[in-house]
UniProtKB/Swiss-Prot annotation:
Gene coding for it: IP5P13
Name of the featured protein: Type I inositol polyphosphate 5-phosphatase 13
Expression by tissue: Expressed in young seedlings and flowers. Highly expressed in anther and pollen grains, but not in pistils. Not detected in maturated roots, stems and rosette leaves.
Keyword field contains Magnesium: yes
CDD domains registered for this protein in UniProt: INPP5c (cd09074)
């Protein structure tokens, strides 16, 4: 090999150069060395590394089947007797069903159970038929396996009172909420893979990936923005569009056009019904409603003409605020838009700044940064990424020409320590790079009281007033905020940790729970639910009453129906571990080890150690890890060779692998269970040379099997007889710090429009607090298997004595001398985990290519044989005799634990362990149906839903308002309820031109019930306290017709619209948690006395008396508004 090989002696010498705790001055002895009848072996132990009580690691949201995990609950203490340390302590675990029935070779083996498994992160996770730690939910779309969603991931959602729409990578889909509790189509149904248990839905034709959605309920349209720069309109009522009986045909868009050169990041509809969209390069465009309306009236076969009509009407705001080449807004990407319907403004959100625009005049009002400071100039230089240090590029292995020649140890030490230092520097540099990222805005929402709330990557939530003044900061969770939504007087926050939090309007925390096992990327309210979408594509509906009495009723009722939706499946798992000593194996050796025992196996996990070693390789591996690269040609050779032995072309399918320096783990699943296996994630934790190099450490794979989570971890722990405490510390370090990579999920997050920096922000850049942050990924799994070269040796025994006992196959006494068993017995390592009875000879150390038990090391060192290569695991059993059910979903037993003594290619023997696992899981389609039956029939639940229909009694000061030019009238809304707040918002149900012949006018709504341009209403939404009132200004603003735009240029701006017009205002009233509303109708009429007035130039300031017009004398009201003395049609309401 080209790289330098580190032999065991050299490794020991190098270890003395590593900054680790010094050796003790006096010899110390572990409990395992007490009462030895043979020659005492001194244990030159390192100082015991203390285990920290807590660990600020990435928030754990991986919760098994994504709905049964809870971090709370009591677990039965470990069954192992810790007081009797000297006796054989093996426990026969209750065999799962269908095991050992008349077939002796499948009888479960006795197992030893380690102490200390009943507390902290080593506690068995709590499971239940219905999650005990969060509100029950409607599983509209259960978590699909990631592998089934390639090219089809859900990106975003939008909701109305009757439908939920979702944007996908390949189109649009929607659910009718009246069908939300219906059964899915099941496996083999006419639905794509991953949607077998999804409630009935409808899909569109294939489109470019969907970036954003907005619902226009006034015109029954759903608008979508796409990655190809197009905006599409979809009819909400697809039944009226379809002309055949086949409801499964994909539906088509009503109209579409090319809106941007880049992806359409966000769409909103302003208070005046115009559509605003944004994209890269700071581009914001407005699409006037009048043009959109005309395009929608064209026939489907005229869609090209409709697209051209809309495209030519665009108003580019960036060009309008650019003067002499200087733009008032930044050229960075506009990520979000927010329509402030209270004050008729639009907020445009860039990463570190906001711009606020007037929705009516389209003027730029203010530009401010995320700290609330007003910025006076745009086009700020983009933030430059930190450059990699030159030494990172050049100094992994190079030495100065002036240096004296160095020996092997010094050169190896320089290379490896240089790489370790590089890893630490990159980690520190990355933390600095994230310091700016943590301020970036990731979400924005308008609350019912008119305040604006924004969330950042750091978890900071900021409240703003409508003018961009920063009011308060709150921070209840130190993970990135990804989305908001509001319902009533509550604000819902979705985090990258999978948490949902509920806040009041003062920012105080009401409730919090883990909603998904992956980031919550979108929230939407409608139909009495708060719907959440996770990056994996799962959609859940949370009742708006949660947390509340409804939760306990549903949880109790649904738990009692467990037998109706509980299912069980069995799977056999083969685990193989081998320290290959930098060699390669023949096909016959691999067949002997693995291929010969896989006929009944569903999953195969293989771990190799010392695939490659040497200072050069370790340094290169560390360098590659810092830039996200892993693996090697030798590692790939091993994966291919093992795959060939498993017949992966016909029988097994390779799921994934992970390599860290010399450590390699890979996993295969049998093809006939492939539809139930997926969501593979990877992890690596280095433990060698300052916890930075992978010559020692662990690599892991996490996978979902029948909706349960299994973790497989391949380890290579510290070497040498005396390093027991270092081995214990290595295990503790791996168990606590193993965070499974979202490497495969990053593509999902990007597809979903989630900021990569938000998604990858880790605990080393953002502090973590609270018990919810302490759980590790491994602690949250249903089954965890550790295997590898653990390096625990036999103590208190000589080489010759060990050889004698081995030759006599007297393993009972040798097991008493096993360091690992002694450490597990006192709860120092592998706490609460189990190992089958060892009945094979020690697997280390052998002379290569020498068969039989005579092959043990006979060289000068004569290393004492030892069981270095082991397989240890835990499942969800809290006692040795648990049965598989939804409270204990994974029950496993070992039916084979062997070493392949005939394989001689390495100084270690390969070990294999076969498990039989019984897995209990939920049929989520059936459970959703049972939930629907409970919701429709339970009297207490129906009573709670009826209470949600309560709306406070309110009144308005008038139902008719008449305005003339520049008039302002006060509309008073009064809340007559003595106890309840009333939430109001004012929309325009339609506008019309008054006909001269007295016929009824045709009222047409603008986009999203927007106001006509001649009318201003302020405030258009808000909260009215009990027995209080609010004054709303209804103001007429002279409007010059600017409806027709060609390439953004007004074509007839010199004409004033002189026709009398009417608008119907809808004053909608809700309670603080109402699912229904009441509406007051107010007719507003504008009378124009002068019929025609042609002006040569558009006036900058409108005069009170236009030429030829007749004006009434006016009064100045206490609010500064004007009102004709002779007009009695409006009654001023009393202000309170």
């Amino acid at each position: 090999m080209d790289s330098l090989i580190i032999e065991e002696e050299d490794e020991e010498a190098l270890a003395t150069l590593v900054p680790v705790p010094p050796r003790r001055k006096t010899h110390s002895y572990s409990l395992q060395f007490d009462h030895k009848p043979h020659h005492q072996i001194r244990k030159h132990s390192l100082d015991e590394v203390p285990r920290s009580a807590t660990l600020a690691s990435e928030a754990v949201y991986f919760d098994s089947s994504d709905d049964e995990f809870s971090t709370g609950g009591n677990i039965t203490e470990n069954a192992a007797d810790e007081t009797n340390a000297g006796a054989e302590e093996y426990t026969i675990v209750n065999p799962p069903p269908n095991v050992g029935l008349g077939d002796d070779d499948t009888e479960p083996l006795p197992e030893f159970i380690g102490a200390g498994g009943g507390s902290g992160i080593f506690k068995v996770p709590v499971r239940a038929a219905v999650h005990p730690g969060r509100p029950p939910c409607l599983e509209l779309r259960p978590h699909p396996l990631r592998e089934t969603q390639t090219g089809r991931f859900l990106r975003n959602i939008a909701c109305t009172e009757t439908q939920l729409w979702a944007g996908q990578e390949n189109g649009i889909r929607f659910w009718n909420l009246e069908d939300a509790y219906e059964a899915g189509c099941g496996i083999g149904g006419q639905v794509p893979r991953g949607d077998e248990d999804t409630a009935p839905f409808h899909e569109s034709v294939t489109t470019s990936p969907t970036m954003c959605l907005v619902a226009d309920q006034s015109n029954k349209l759903l608008w979508s923005g796409h990655k190809d720069g197009k905006i599409r309109a979809w009819k909400m009522d697809q039944s009226s569009v379809s002309h055949d009986d086949d409801d499964s045909d994909p539906f088509k868009e009503r109209v579409s056009w090319l809106a941007h050169r880049g992806p359409v990041n966000s769409i909103v509809i302003s208070s005046y019904g115009d559509m605003w969209s944004c994209s890269e390069g700071g581009v914001i465009k407005i699409w006037p409603w009048d043009t959109l309306e005309k395009s929608l009236l064209l026939k489907p076969e005229e869609k090209h003409m409709a697209a051209l009509l809309v495209e030519r009407s665009a108003i580019d705001l960036r060009s309008q605020v650019t003067v002499n080449g200087t733009c008032s807004i930044s050229s960075s990407e506009v990520k979000f838009l927010l329509a402030d319907s209270v004050r008729a403004k639009v907020w445009a959100v860039q990463s570190l700044s906001f711009s606020i625009w007037d929705a009516r005049s389209k003027d730029l009002l203010k530009v401010l940064n995320v700290d609330g400071q007003v910025e006076n100039r745009g086009d700020l230089p983009p933030i430059q990424d930190q450059q990699v240090d030159d030494e990172m590029k050049l100094k992994f292995f190079s030495a100065s020409k002036r240096e004296k020649p160095q020996g092997f140890l010094q050169r190896s030490r320089n290379a490896i320590m240089g790489a370790a230092g590089a890893v630490r520097r990159v980690a520190t540099r990355s933390a600095g790079a994230f310091s700016e990222d943590t301020r970036k805005t990731e979400a924005i929402v308008l609350a019912v009281d008119g305040t604006i709330w924004t969330g950042s990557i750091s978890g900071l939530i900021v409240q703003w007033d409508g003018n961009g003044n920063r009011l308060r900061d709150v921070n209840h969770h130190h993970r990135p905020v990804l989305c908001f939504c509001t319902f009533g007087d509550r604000i819902y926050v979705g985090y990258a940790s999978g948490y949902i939090q509920v806040l009041d309007l003062d920012g105080k925390l009401i409730s919090s729970w883990v909603s998904h096992n992956e980031p919550v990327i979108k929230l939407a309210a409608g139909g009495g639910f708060i719907f959440s979408l996770a990056t994996h594509g799962g959609v859940r509906g949370w009742y708006v009453t949660s947390p509340g009495p409804l939760d306990n009723i549903i949880r109790t009722e649904l738990s009692q129906k467990e037998t109706l939706y509980a299912r069980q499946d069995n799977v056999r798992i083969l685990i193989g571990t081998w320290n290959v000593g930098q060699g390669r194996a023949s096909h016959d050796a691999l067949m002997s080890w693995l291929g010969s025992v896989t006929s009944d196996v569903g999953i195969v996990a293989v771990g190799l150690q010392e695939v490659e070693m040497g200072a050069g390789f370790l340094a290169m591996s560390a360098a590659k890890e810092t830039v996200g690269l892993e693996g090697s040609a030798v590692g790939q050779w091993w994966i291919d060779a093992i795959g060939k032995a498993l017949d992966e072309k016909n029988t097994f399918e390779r799921m994934g692998s992970r390599q860290l320096a010399g450590l390699l783990i890979s996993l295969w699943a049998r093809k006939d269970i492939r539809t139930h296996v997926g969501d593979l994630d990877v992890a690596a934790v280095p433990c060698g040379f300052g916890r930075a190099i992978g010559n020692k450490g662990g690599v892991g794979l996490r996978i979902r099997v029948y909706d349960r989570i299994m973790c497989f971890v391949n380890c290579h722990l510290a070497a040498h007889l005396e390093a027991v405490n270092r081995r214990n510390a290595d295990f503790n370090h791996i168990f606590r710090l193993m965070v499974f990579s979202r490497g495969q999920n990053l593509s999902n997050a990007a597809a979903a429009g989630v900021s990569t920096s938000a998604y990858t922000t880790k605990s080393n850049t953002i502090p973590s607090t609270g018990a919810e942050e302490i759980k590790s990924d491994l602690a949250a799994a249903d089954m965890v298997a550790f295997f590898g070269d653990f390096n625990y040796r036999l103590f208190g025994i000589t080489y010759d004595e060990a050889r004698d006992f081995i030759s006599q196959r007297s393993f009972d006494w040798l097991r008493e001398r096993d360091q690992l068993r002694a450490e597990m017995k006192v709860g120092k390592v592998f706490q609460g985990m189990r190992e089958a009875l060892i009945t094979f000879p020690p697997t280390y150390k052998f002379e290569r290519n020498r068969s039989g038990l005579g092959g043990y090391d006979s060289g000068e060192k004569k290393r004492i044989p030892a069981w270095c290569d082991r397989v240890i695991y835990r499942d969800t059993q809290s006692s040795p005799f648990s049965e598989s059910n939804l409270q204990c979903p994974v029950v496993s037993s070992v039916i084979m634990y062997e070493a392949c003594m005939d394989v001689t290619e390495s100084d270690h023997k390969p070990v294999r362990c076969k498990f039989h696992a019984t897995i209990a899981h939920v049929d989520k389609s059936v459970r959703r149906q049972e939930l629907g039956k409970i919701i429709r029939s339970n009297e207490k639940i129906l009573s709670i839903f009826e209470d949600l229909r309560f709306v406070p009694e309110t009144s308005v000061s008038t139902n008719n308002i008449v305005l003339q030019s520049q008039d302002t009238v006060i509309l008073t809304i009064t809340n007559n309820s003595p106890t309840s707040q009333a939430i109001f918002n004012i929309l325009c149900g339609g506008q019309a031109v008054v006909k001269d012949d007295g016929e009824d006018a045709d009222y047409n709504p603008r986009g999203s019930f927007g106001l006509p341009r001649w009318l201003e209403v302020s405030p258009a939404a808000g909260i009215i306290n009990p027995e209080g009132s609010v004054d709303v200004k209804v103001h007429h603003e002279d409007f010059y017709s600017m409806e027709e735009y060609v390439d953004g240029i007004p074509q007839n701006w010199w004409c004033e619209d002189t026709r009398d017009k009417e608008a119907i205002l809808m004053v909608n009233i809700r309670g603080s948690c109402s699912t229904t509303l009441r509406s007051h109708s107010v007719k507003v009429r504008h009378c124009f006395s002068a019929r025609v007035c042609l002006l040569e130039n558009r006036p900058t300031n409108l005069t009170k008396n236009l030429g030829g017009s007749r004006r009434y004398p006016t009064d100045i009201t206490r609010n500064g508004s004007t009102r004709p003395r002779t007009e009695d049609s409006v009654r001023r309401g009393k202000s309170r």
